[in-house]
Amino acid sequence: MKEIELYRLSTDEKIVHVPETRSIVVRFNAPKKVLSTSLLNGGYREDIKGFFNYTCCGPGSCMSLEKYEEHLGKCAAVMGLDPARSTGIGTAARMENAAIVEETYEELKVAACVTAGVEGNAGCAGDPAGYYGAGARPEMYKPGTINILLFINADMPPGILTRALVTCTEGKTAALRELMVGSRYSENPATGTGTDSTVIICDPKSPLYFRSAGKHNKLGELIGKTVKEAVKKALGNQNHLYPSTQHSVTERLRRYGVTEEVLYSYFREYKKDGIEEEWRHLWRKIDRDSEMVFISSFLAELLDEYRWGLAGNEEACRMAKKLLQMTAEAYGMRSVPMEIKSAEDIKDAFCRLAVQAAVKKNGI
């Protein structure tokens, strides 16, 4: 099978893309310490000989979780790896969209290879779950997975390799925060997806030996930087998710239910014969306006603080009304006539005001 070299590690192992099997494969040329979240030979291991990440399906469900572990073993064999001595993870993301980032400090090198998609499955830790999991084996969820392969050219004890996983996860969450990705299951900012996987590999023969992988240590810094940057690049490649595309009212407030479809229902109240295509045309002329985008960001933050108990209902409603008044003035409208007494009132008032602003800006 044809292999395309994507990257050569400092230990001379290659990260290769195998188009025929829709996979990224790494074969180790020396013993490694491996920490894997995979169902296939997961946990801490010192006998793993290779790794793969592969595109397991297209849009929609893949297979039952009950069959997934067995399936991973079969995939390993197809890729020329020993199923008993390899670990692998799957995703709906395309391997062509993988991002690789390396950071160095003196002799230390940390490289992250990431595939990522969040459009259908972004979630926040603590969101309502879809199943219990102790006995039931449901179908796999919507496409949307962040898979991270992290290489460290240093040695460390197993506990610190586990600590590196914590830092790696924080780096992933920082990337989602900087892109303002919201949960698809709640009103919370996303911290990951429901199916994320991580594999961390370090070199037991390296003269570099670390007893810390937290944020105060240079190793922790490099882990955070590589993972954060690689996750952001992979999301751009897979979902066309960039800072520029997130400069949008509906992206900032999507997790609070403010979408083009919802705003269209408000538009129909304003113009009963309005058609959806007309509304989309009107809205897209205002969705990225600086005033509207930043007001929506402030409102999202205000609603977050209210939900988290950092702001009381009365002060949240009072400040929301001031923000909405600023919006009205920015678009040449007189005032916000609604009485605002709750978070639902805040969202309702914003939707009505946003529709009026779009209509006014387009001269209707």
Which stretches of residues belong to each language-model region?
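Alpha/propeptide regions of enzymes that mature by internal proteolysis
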Residues: M1-I364
